[in-house]
Structure formats: C-alpha cells, structure tokens
C-alpha cells in the first residue's frame, strides 16, 4: 500500500541515468513518478510528457524524478534515445519502491506518482494514464 498524504517521505539515494549518485530529502517541492519500464510505450509517453513540462515545474521550484526498477545503463539508453532532460533514478533492487509502498510485480513498479514537500507526502496519484498525467500533477 503506497504512502499517503501526511506520511513522511523517506529520503532517497540513487544513481541517475548519468551514473551520478543523488540524494533527495523531499524538503523542497518534488514530484517522484514511478513507472514500470524504460522504452515501453506508456512509460515513454509519460517520461516525454514530464520532460516537456520540466521547465514549468522548475519555474515553480519543483524538482522532478522518474523511478523504475531498470538499471543505470537502461536509463542512460532510454534517456539518450528519447533525449530526456528529466532525471531518472535507478531502483534495480526495488528499495525505493518498497520505501514508498509502491507495488512491484514481476520486477516492475506500478505507475504511481508522489508529490512531496517539507519532508512529507502531499499528493498521491495511482493507476494513472500516462497521456496527460504530467500536466495533471
């Protein structure tokens, strides 16, 4: 069961598609979107739409991270293929998904998005349709 609004947002340390380790403490406004797999149709749509909205999010002071159970190499290939600027976090052991209570089935995280700020969950979107989701958050 996913964490809910009002729950503390667990800090995350993970590698990006560039192989850099980042730590996100969720004190600042942050969107964390979990998606099942790199380079699949729905996930490609969702990642591209978050990427297109990235400047709007940044202008509002909101960081955006995509998370899947794919590894850094997969994220790098996906980001290069799609020319993505959005930061993708590798979660090959599903530890981030587990910390947020995101269901992982057959090695793939359920499509779930969290809006966080002040170290807590402020919003939760589950079972979303990829098309238009980035704009609706």
What are these regions (language model features)?
Residues 1-137:
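Chalcogenol-based redox active-site neighborhoods
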